[in-house]
Amino acid sequence: MSATVSTVSADLHKAIDAGDEDKITKITASYGSEQRDKIIPAYHANYGIPPSEAIRKAFKTGFYETMIVHAWTSRFELRAKLIHESIKGKIDVITLLDLVIACMPDDWYGTKVCYTKLYGRELVREIDEVIGVGTPWQSLVSGWVKHDRKYRKSIKSDAEAFRMALDSDNYEVLGSMLATSVPDEWMRIAAAYEETTGMPIDQAIASRYVKVDQTALILAHHWLCDPGQAAAYICSQCCAERKGNYARICRFTSMMYDHCLKCKYAYRAYGSLAMDIRKCFEPKLAKHLLVFWRVE
């Protein structure tokens, strides 16, 4: 961190007091989640209030305020609380998929610890009990949350096994392969699949599955290939809706922009990230999203 924690805390405090959204966004976007987690307690110690609470008091409730509040909440606490919200009552599947699949391994471990502290339940067991079984997305999530990956060293046979599972709608095999593959080996499996079939894996999945099952499997594939690729996929879905999916893009941006800086390049598969953000979201929010995703 180029500036000291106390300096950043002071700069953020001044920006919040002044109601300067542009400055707040610039400061927030300059630091990753691990760095922000060091700034949060310093801010609290200096000003007697967490930055998230200071932001809530300074701004009207809305998507921008929620996005910035999320960004200035401990990453483990935030993910744990959002997962809990997504699985209580009717399951918010898309939100759960984003929170579970698009998560760095170290962040997942920290989230599990925090979840137990907050709710007295073991996170993986809680998810397994709540989501049930019987669909592709359920099978994938059940395996994914265990974070038990290993090298199989059988690229061609794995690519063929995935093809056969797709052709026969064997979603248990599909979910298991995605949930247990090591990222660099998965990229080779995906390349072998495309070489053999002439079709990229994401297109093959899209030809077989729809709605949340399609989203789950394609998101997992992209995440294993590169977090930026997964971010581009999520952003493309947010921008595909006529008015834009405000809640989803704000939530995902606040949590993952620093891990997915290749998003703007991967998004070229769907068009221009900057143009789509401007088209789908109101200007007041769009300008902040552009800063986080490093596009103009």
Curated annotation (Swiss-Prot):
It comes from the Eukaryota. SUPFAM superfamilies: Annexin (SSF47874). Annexin repeats lie at residues 3-72, 74-146, 153-223, 226-294. Keywords: Annexin, Cytoplasm, Cytoskeleton, Microtubule, Repeat. GO terms for molecular function: calcium ion binding; calcium-dependent phospholipid binding; phosphatidylserine binding. GO terms for biological process: cytoskeleton organization. GO terms for cellular component: cytoplasm; microtubule; plasma membrane. It is found in: Cytoplasm, Cytoskeleton. Belongs to the annexin family. Giardin subunit alpha subfamily. Giardins are involved in parasite attachment to the intestinal mucosa and in the cytoskeletal disassembly and reassembly that marks the transition from infectious trophozoite to transmissible cyst. They may interact with other cytoskeletal proteins such as microtubules in the microribbons or crossbridges, to maintain the integrity of the ventral disk. This is Giardin subunit alpha-4. It comes from Giardia intestinalis.
